A protein has these predicted regions:
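Tandem CBS (Cystathionine beta-synthase) repeat/Bateman regulatory domains
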Residues: 1-163
Length: 163
């Protein structure tokens, strides 16, 4: 079975300057976990739920955060105050950050003519869950682990292709 038989055609994509809050809205609206990131018609990256979780993890406030008493406040070095302000600002403005700041730049892709088994093996090898499908440099679909499972299940039940 070919990738073209199992892929989702016309995948949801987003421009590289899309704010993260809009990307998250696209994830939720379309029940997806990743978006191909485009500059014009060119695929330039991939942003996934994992990228967002990693960002939140890196922006987390330390568990050993020390909050001074009013008497100790005078003794806090000014650099600690500046770092705290930067952290608060970063946490407040994550939603405004463009996806290009956190996306994966090296995108592993598939072609329509690739066998589904080869696409599955590539996903396993690369530790990813979806592959944009390209025809030349144009994105024509996306294939996910769920698409592969659906296609295999459909072939076993006598149906043709994914639903």
């Amino acid at each position: 079975m070919l990738v073209s038989d199992a892929m989702t055609k016309e995948p949801v994509t987003c421009p590289a300057d899309t704010p993260l809050r809009d990307a998250v809205a696209l994830f939720r609206k379309n029940h997806i976990g990743g978006l191909p990131v485009m500059e014009g018609r060119e695929l330039v990256g991939m942003v996934t739920e994992s990228d967002l979780i990693a960002l939140l993890e890196s922006e987390r406030i330390s568990d050993d955060l020390w909050l001074p008493s009013p008497f100790e406040i005078i003794e806090i070095p000014i650099r600690e105050f500046i770092n705290w302000e930067k952290t608060k600002h970063a946490l407040t403005n994550i939603g405004d950050m463009p996806v290009k700041k956190i996306m994966t730049h090296h995108v592993v892709t598939a072609t329509e003519e690739m066998e589904v088994e080869a696409a599955a093996a590539l996903m396993l090898k690369e530790g990813i869950t979806r592959l944009p499908v390209l025809r030349g440099k144009t994105i024509v679909g996306i294939i996910t682990r769920a698409d592969i499972i659906n296609a295999i299940g459909a072939s076993y039940s006598g149906k043709d292709g994914a639903e």
